[in-house]
Amino acid sequence: MNKSYFHDNSNIVAEGLRRLRKEKGMSQEELAAQLQLMGVDIDQRLISKIERNERFVKDYELACLCRVLDVTERELLADFYERFGD
């Protein structure tokens, strides 16, 4: 029986978020602070949980993450698209 990718990896944002945040030279604290300035109630602890695939990302959080990181949703989800194609 094939193991489902989504069963263990329900948050497809995790890998891309960690990668892009580090590429931008941002700490989890800095990212959380920028999100809070946009009115998103996320602290460093929640950023860490998202990056460890322990917390889902809400749709408005996804949009705000993209804005803060200055990337498109497609760029943030690039790891998912590379795994499964377009």
Spans of model-derived segments:
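A short, Lys/Arg-rich alpha-helix, primarily the initiator
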Residues: 1-23
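Short, charged recognition helix plus adjacent turn
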Residues: 2-7, 67, 74-86
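Flexible coil/turn residues that form the inter-helical turn or adjacent wing/linker of helix-turn-helix
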Residues: 13, 24, 40, 55-58
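Helix-turn-helix DNA-binding elements, focusing on the entry/boundary residues of the two helices
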Residues: 17, 28, 44, 59-62
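Residue-level detection of the helix-turn-helix DNA-binding "recognition helix"
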Residues: 22, 36-37, 52, 81
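Short alpha-helical DNA-recognition segment
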Residues: 25-49
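DNA major-groove recognition helix of helix-turn-helix/homeodomain DNA-binding modules
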Residues: 54, 58-75
